[in-house]
Amino acid sequence: MKTTFLDFEQPIAELEAKIEELRFVQDDSAVDISEEIERLSKKSQQLTKDLYANLSPWQVSQIARHPQRPYTLDYVAELFTDFHELHGDRAFADDLSIVGGLARFGGHPCMVIGHQKGRDTKERAARNFGMPRPEGYRKAERLMRLAEKFGLPIFTFVDTPGAYPGIGAEERGQSEAIGRNLYVMAELKTPIITTVIGEGGSGGALAIAVADTVMMLQFSTYSVISPEGCASILWKSAAKAPEAAEALGLTAHRLKALGLIDKIINEPLGGAHRDPKGMAALLRRALADSLRQFQGMSIDALRERRFERLMAYGKFKETTPGA
């Protein structure tokens, strides 16, 4: 698949286009231009490295939303075996914006749950662009209860702009469904490992992210509101989104510094979408390390650790100027 470049990546796009052109010429020419292709490839790689070393929060937000970025089902295919998807909340409908089911990780049974946005127009509409309705969260709760019953660890993957704010969703109890998931996950008697793989949008993300370990991919985001939404409220203009992204502190490094997440998983050069298999390999190691941490831990110790972790959110320290 041809790589889609973001606006701020245009210098890289131009170099890659030139390299592709030279490769095409070389195939139809007796002249050896392999050295020039290699030189430009190294230049493109260095340019990418320099650009990605100095990304603004707004640019990170754009990468987190990249249309070619791996989604939950892409990681399921790479990381898990024997995946059997489970459908429906047993109350209203099957919300396709949340996928989940039984699987094996490293040969051991587990439960996998995550947001799914969709690749093309038809699938995006069917999956509501990754914005769950109440039935999606209730499906997630049902699967988590099932995992608890059989003592299966739960892996969740977060990638949503937020919970769907439509009238029907509100009528069916959107806030209740989200709130119930927060309550249920805080009390579950099985390990929960969450990874933010793209966008972590507000309560819509948190409803499957109350976990024993929360990790973020290097160029993912996690925030109470989107930069555009924040800008529209504070400045009455979505054009102020770059400033809002800076103020929100939504990047993985910022959240790790604040103690809100446990680990950052580095992405391949240029982002996860440039090397999905490489990203999956890095994620596999991180998930295995996290799961190993909870093996042999008693249920009481696990829940106590989770409670202490949750209660640590919002702690602050008062300082006296000049002290």
UniProtKB/Swiss-Prot annotation:
InterPro entries: Acetyl_CoA_COase_a_su (IPR001095), ClpP/crotonase-like_dom_sf (IPR029045), COA_CT_C (IPR011763). GO terms for biological process: fatty acid biosynthetic process; malonyl-CoA biosynthetic process. It catalyses: N(6)-carboxybiotinyl-L-lysyl-[protein] + acetyl-CoA = N(6)-biotinyl-L-lysyl-[protein] + malonyl-CoA. Keywords: ATP-binding, Cytoplasm, Fatty acid biosynthesis, Fatty acid metabolism, Lipid biosynthesis, Lipid metabolism, Nucleotide-binding, Transferase. Residues 39-293 form the CoA carboxyltransferase C-terminal domain. It is an enzyme of class 2 (transferase). It is found in: Cytoplasm. Its EC number is 2.1.3.15. One of its GO terms (cellular component) is acetyl-CoA carboxylase complex. Pfam families: ACCA. One of its GO terms (molecular function) is carboxyl- or carbamoyltransferase activity. Pathway: Lipid metabolism; malonyl-CoA biosynthesis; malonyl-CoA from acetyl-CoA: step 1/1. Acetyl-CoA carboxylase is a heterohexamer composed of biotin carboxyl carrier protein (AccB), biotin carboxylase (AccC) and two subunits each of ACCase subunit alpha (AccA) and ACCase subunit beta (AccD). Component of the acetyl coenzyme A carboxylase (ACC) complex. First, biotin carboxylase catalyzes the carboxylation of biotin on its carrier protein (BCCP) and then the CO(2) group is transferred by the carboxyltransferase to acetyl-CoA to form malonyl-CoA. Belongs to the AccA family. This is Acetyl-coenzyme A carboxylase carboxyl transferase subunit alpha. It comes from Burkholderia cenocepacia (strain HI2424).
